[in-house]
A protein has these predicted regions:
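Catalytic cores of DNA base-excision repair glycosylases
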Residues: 87-196
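Intrinsically disordered, low-complexity, charged terminal extensions of DNA damage-control enzymes
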Residues: 1-62
Length: 196
């Protein structure tokens, strides 16, 4: 439980790299979780008081979330939002069928690398063919879901963890290798290096 809320409160340091139009869903936590953390760590308690409640947007659609996270790898939030807007404009709705119907070159023309376009196309093809049961991932444990997502081209542990957090709202994910989380922990605890 501690890990879940460390992420919530340290996420203020991480820039939001996606925003979904329309009715927003937010990562859910309450006073019980906040009070638990405050009792466990004085520095975190101070940060919680300074930052206050954080509304962290979630992705509503699992397929679109996976595609969005592949698109957003190693680019700025602004660039990711631009590419995503172009993708939505071209496809109308980002679904396995609409992505599967597009060529990698067409996807690349929207501003992503050809490699990312191929990853997204491969992912959509696996969904359409039934080779990858996307909805079944929701029923897996965190580690099983990370392994399932990581079996796809273009998705490593970090991307899988982001999908679990920002779409599936898994409470016990701390993407320890995330540079922004590392930076946030160093700032909060005044350490040069953070280890597990």
């Amino acid at each position: 439980m501690l890990i879940r809320y460390y992420f919530c409160f340290l996420s203020v340091i991480i820039s939001l790299y996606f925003q979904k139009a329309g009715a927003a869903m937010f990562f859910q936590y309450g006073e019980k979780e906040i009070n638990y953390l405050k009792r466990k760590d004085k520095k975190l308690a101070w940060a919680i008081e300074q930052i206050g409640h954080i509304e962290r947007r979630l992705d509503a659609d699992l397929f679109a979330s996976v595609v969005r996270h592949i698109v957003g790898q190693q680019i700025s939030s602004k660039a990711q939002a631009t590419v995503w807007a172009r993708l939505e404009a071209r496809l109308s709705v980002v679904t396995p069928a609409s992505v599967h119907a597009a060529s990698p070159e067409e996807l690349q023309s929207l501003g992503m690398s050809l490699r990312k376009a191929e990853y997204i196309k491969d992912f959509a093809s696996k969904i359409v063919s039934g080779e990858f049961a996307l909805q079944a991932v929701e029923q897996l444990s965190d580690e099983e879901a990370i392994a399932a997502f990581s079996s796809l081209k273009g998705i490593g542990r970090w991307t899988a963890e982001m999908i679990l957090l920002f779409c599936l709202q898994r409470p016990d994910i701390l993407s320890f290798d995330d540079l922004a989380i590392q930076r946030g922990l160093r700032m909060l605890y005044h350490h040069r290096k953070i280890t597990r």
